Amino acid sequence: MGIIVLKNEGLNFHARISTPLSEIDDDIQKELLDLTKKVKVAGFRAGKVPVSIVKKKYGTSVRHDIIEKRINNLVNHIIKEYNLNIIGRPKIEELQNEPDKDLEFTVKIELLPKITIPDLKKISLDRPKLAVNSQDVEIQLEKLAALTKCYTKESKTKIKDGDQVTIDAIGYIKDRAFDGGKLNDFKVVIGSNTLIQGFEQQLIGSKTGNEVDVNVTFPENYHDKNLSGKDAHFVVQIKAVHTAEPTIIDEEFAKKFQSNSLEELRTHFAKQIENESEEAINTIMKMNLFDKLEKLLDFDVPESLLEQEKNILKSETDKNKHDGSLLNGKSSKEITEYYNKLALRRVRIGLLLAEYAKFKNLQLEPDDFKKIIMQQARNFPGQENMIFDFYKNNPRAIEGLKGPALEDKTVQYIFNNEIQLKEKRYTKEELEKYLETEEQRISLI
């Protein structure tokens, strides 16, 4: 075997490899002899087929298999001999495999960079913490009370905000009734915004037995494209009006919601309010950590990974164009620079986290997959069971979660064991503003 190293610098290793024709022919001959004992050919006893017959019938495919096997063995030998930390599949070029010449080819191998893990203990980050106050809790209790109102008291007075109204209605567009525009014995709480914007407000001041003309415009993004953006006229019959008995928030109220006391229900809501912001906080904390890491990392990255990441970015941008892409109005040069910078950031951080996970021997457990599937399910409200069933019935889809699951586990390990976290307390209103600002920022990265 002959090896001529053509390039061994940065993350690229190129070599020209050759192996004598005699060795190839020996391997082919040996394989053909083995086949004479296995193949069945009409007119010959089993195991007695002449090698010339076998060669005529199988020679081409045997040679192809031997060449492929020899190339793989030679490439693996090169990788081991030069201790190459490769990424992806080696590329075989300029292959010379004529039957009367030595086997020669050029192999091009892309390498992973040597990564030095920075001192993560020097990183310091603020961690937002929601300071839940009694007013936040009382607002949630009042919302719960509003949802559980009993509309039992019939009212003969004029309709006001908060009343429950039972109606019949027929909708018209240009004086023609349209499909889906008819309501019978429909109950709506005024101010709940259950119906099209402006509909409920036009019932205020009417009484049971009145006929009311309601004029509305369907929103442009209405689910029925035949109605979106169109003006409509509804003829509404007021059949009944009910007011709710006042809901008293007391110990008995709390017991309706599996709480032993009102204080226990308040504690439950305080914890719920805290938890509602946790996922958003964790996402922002992760991006803030990545911002710090980006400044510490300067190693070269494999070109193939960079191109792959740029293609993902382009695909994401194309998918979200209708949302008003940040690249709208940018020159092709600016767009290229954006893709290059962001792809480099993502690849560097991804490689560092993979190296760190390997160094710390972090392994995925079943609970890690459950956690990330739960995160996926939360993105599809009302379809959670469908998401769970999908992953349960598609083991290969679970494989696709390994990368994100290990990244999340590694980031959490770094938060728990490496960097310095300083708690910064926010009121609910302050935290909502902070999260909104940060979510807009990280949407760009």
From Swiss-Prot:
It holds the Pfam family Trigger_C. It comes from the Bacteria. It is found in: Cytoplasm. SUPFAM superfamilies: FKBP-like, Triger factor/SurA peptide-binding domain-like, Trigger factor ribosome-binding domain. Keywords: Cell cycle, Cell division, Chaperone, Cytoplasm, Isomerase, Rotamase. GO terms for biological process: 'de novo' cotranslational protein folding; cell division; chaperone-mediated protein folding; protein transport; protein unfolding. Its EC number is 5.2.1.8. One of its GO terms (cellular component) is cytoplasm. It is an enzyme of class 5 (isomerase). GO terms for molecular function: peptidyl-prolyl cis-trans isomerase activity; protein folding chaperone; ribosome binding. It catalyses: [protein]-peptidylproline (omega=180) = [protein]-peptidylproline (omega=0). The keyword Translocase does not apply. Residues 162-247 form the PPIase FKBP-type domain. Signal peptide: none annotated. Its main location: cytoplasm. Consists of 3 domains; the N-terminus binds the ribosome, the middle domain has PPIase activity, while the C-terminus has intrinsic chaperone activity on its own. Belongs to the FKBP-type PPIase family. Tig subfamily. Involved in protein export. Acts as a chaperone by maintaining the newly synthesized protein in an open conformation. Functions as a peptidyl-prolyl cis-trans isomerase. This is Trigger factor. It comes from Rickettsia prowazekii (strain Madrid E).
